[in-house]
Amino acid sequence: MKPSLFTALFATILLFHPLPGAAQQASLPDPVDGVEWRAGTAVEGGMILAKTAPGVRLELDGVSLPQDVTGHALIGFHRDSDSPVTLTILHPDGRRDSVSMMPAQRDYAVQRIDGLKRGHVTPPQEVLDRIGADSAAVRAARDVIDAGPDTGDFIAGLEMPVEGRITGVYGSQRILNGEPRQPHYGIDIAAPRGTPVMAPAAGRVTLVRDLYFSGWTFLMTHGLGLN
C-alpha cells in the first residue's frame, strides 16, 4: 500500500481550483458530524481543507492531523493513491466516526527517453553523495510543521509566486533507458533572471540551499503540514 498522507504537502493552487481530467470527477466526502469540508477534492496529489467543531480531533490512517486553533486541518493524498484512506473523527465525548475516501485517479505526463549514455542516467558517486545530502536537508525542512503566527494564512487563498510560462507540471515523470525517475512534485514557472518571487502565502522559511537539481531553493512551511 502506498502512503496516503504527505509528510509535507506542496503549496499549489490545486487546493482551491478545479483539476483537469480525472480530478473533475472527484468530490468532497459526504457530510459527517463534527467536520465541515471547506475546499479541495479527494484526488491523487490533491488536498481537502476541513474545519472541525470545537474539541474534535482528526486522524488519517491512524496518524494525528495537525489542526490550528480554529479547527482547520489538511487531508493530503499521495500522487499514486491507489488505496482508500480512512479519516477518523474523535469527538470530545468519546465517540468515534470514520470516513473512507478513495481518491480519484489521475493521468500523468510520462516521457520515455532511450539510448542515453549511462553517464547521463546514473551520475558519478560524488554527485550521488550531494544529491543524498540535498534530499536529507529537504526532508528535515519538510518535517517542520509549525509556522508560528502565520499558520493557516493560506486558508484565505494562495497566490502564484511569479507570472510566467509553465514549463513543468505536477506528477510528470521521465523514464530514462527504462529506469523511472522521481516524479515531479511541483509546478515550474519560467521567468527572466532577477524577477522577484513572492511567497504564495505567509509562512516560515525552513531551508535556503543550493540544490543539485533545482539550484538555489527555499522552502517554507505554512502550517498544518503544508509547505
List the predicted regions and their residue ranges:
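Conserved structural position at the C-terminal beta-strand
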Residues: 89-91
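N-terminal signal peptide c-region/cleavage motif recognized by signal peptidases
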Residues: 17-20
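Short proline/glycine-enriched turn/loop motifs at strand-loop junctions of beta-rich domains
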Residues: 49-57
